[in-house]
């Protein structure tokens, strides 16, 4: 067996030499060199100093600028809140524990860190799903005479919380569990063991079907239909350069959004599934740590893609940061005017990442 299982932990290293110790009580420097833990702490610090400002700024400018408080932007605020959950509930804890080389907060701290990190990650994931559905409903109009309003937006936000809790809460009440993962400095769902009484197998299968494959299918379907609708509208107005430019912009945005989702979740899901289906096989602590980096980094690049690329949000952010004046206002205004001159069903603003 490649790993050593103990009470509420699994260390991916054989204990033949007798060096394996509980990750709740002893530094894990026998897994990787101490400098690697320092590097992990530095990376977490980078995510904190970049993830907190951009997500907090999103909330702040929305409060400050009334024109941003529209139903279609509710889900973006929810995404920012989800990222802040990851920053405060996951990144800060992992940075501190990495500096010590083990999970110093014990079993209770592992449950709390695992819960908040999972809750934030799942809220972010389902926010992207709801965002895709909302854009599909608004642009493709699968339901005739449908008008997206505040009640729909609130239901979408509530749905993300329900789905996130349906993933983050069960390990706290006996369906699977949270244990230190990778380099043993952060906690996540137990993919490693088949410990009797915690039903890891059924929970992992549930996770992959409900919280990975279904979101993946929904996002591909919604954005696929959206691109087809935009291309059809652009084909009807081939003589309009503005329409063609809008079509290219929408296609580019959709590709970026889908790739970002895959970069965030595919490595983590793939490695977790491999570990689950190959229990006892050879894999090191870095094998699980690196994919988790991709998922954690989403707290930084998701706001950049879904919020900062939106012209209205970007303008308000720059205005706020520059004390009420946007030095790029003429350029932004010219771009907005050009887009408004086109009386077309192709609207990059309604399908843009924000």
Curated annotation (Swiss-Prot):
GO terms for molecular function: 11-cis retinal binding; G protein-coupled photoreceptor activity; photoreceptor activity; retinal binding. Pfam families: 7tm_1, Rhodopsin_N. Retinal rod photoreceptor cells, predominantly in the outer segments (at protein level). Retinal rod photoreceptor cells. Residues 62-73, 134-152, 225-252, 309-354 are cytoplasmic. Residues 333-354 are annotated as: Disordered. GO terms for cellular component: membrane; photoreceptor disc membrane; photoreceptor outer segment; plasma membrane. Glycans are attached at residues 2, 15, 200. Phosphorylated on some or all of the serine and threonine residues present in the C-terminal region. The record marks 113 as: Plays an important role in the conformation switch to the active conformation. GO terms for biological process: absorption of visible light; cellular response to light stimulus; detection of light stimulus; G protein-coupled opsin signaling pathway; G protein-coupled receptor signaling pathway; phototransduction; visual perception. InterPro entries: GPCR_opsins, GPCR_Rhodpsn, GPCR_Rhodpsn_7TM, Opsin, Retinal_BS, Rhodopsin, Rhodopsin_N. Residues 1-36, 97-110, 174-202, 275-286 are extracellular. PANTHER family: OPSIN (PTHR24240). This is Rhodopsin. It comes from Danio rerio (Zebrafish). The gene is rho.
């Amino acid at each position: 067996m490649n790993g050593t299982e103990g009470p509420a932990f699994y260390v991916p290293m054989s204990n033949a030499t007798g060096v394996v110790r509980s990750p709740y009580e002893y530094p894990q420097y026998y897994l990787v060199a101490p400098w690697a833990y320092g590097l992990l702490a530095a990376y977490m610090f980078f995510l904190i100093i970049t993830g907190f400002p951009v997500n907090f700024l999103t909330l702040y400018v929305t409060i400050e600028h009334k024109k941003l408080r529209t139903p279609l932007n509710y889900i973006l605020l929810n995404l920012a809140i989800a990222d802040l959950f990851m920053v405060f509930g996951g990144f800060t804890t992992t940075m501190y524990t990495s500096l010590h080389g083990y999970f110093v907060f014990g079993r209770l701290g592992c449950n709390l860190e695992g819960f908040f990190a999972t809750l934030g990650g799942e809220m972010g994931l389902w926010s992207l799903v709801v965002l895709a559905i909302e854009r599909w409903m608004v642009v493709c109009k699968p339901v005739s005479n449908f008008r997206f309003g505040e009640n729909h937006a609130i239901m979408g936000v509530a749905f993300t919380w329900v789905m996130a809790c349906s993933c983050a809460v069960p390990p706290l009440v006996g369906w699977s569990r949270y244990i230190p993962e990778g380099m043993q400095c952060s906690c996540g769902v137990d993919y490693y063991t088949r410990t009797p009484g915690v039903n890891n197998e059924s929970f992992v299968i549930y996770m992959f079907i409900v919280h990975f494959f279904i979101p993946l299918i929904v996002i591909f379907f919604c954005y696929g239909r959206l691109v087809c609708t935009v291309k059809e509208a652009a084909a009807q107005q081939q003589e309009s350069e503005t329409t063609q430019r809008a079509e290219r912009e929408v296609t580019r945005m959709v590709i970026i959004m889908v790739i970002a989702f895959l970069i965030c979740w595919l490595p983590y899901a793939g490695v977790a599934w491999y570990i689950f289906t190959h229990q006892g096989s050879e894999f090191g602590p870095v094998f699980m740590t690196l994919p988790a980096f991709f998922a954690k980094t989403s707290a930084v690049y998701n706001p950049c893609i879904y919020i900062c690329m939106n012209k209205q949000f970007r303008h308000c952010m720059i205005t706020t940061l520059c004390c009420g004046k946007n030095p790029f206002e003429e350029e932004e205004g010219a771009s907005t005017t050009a887009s408004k001159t086109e009386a077309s069903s192709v609207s990059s603003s309604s399908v843009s990442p924000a």
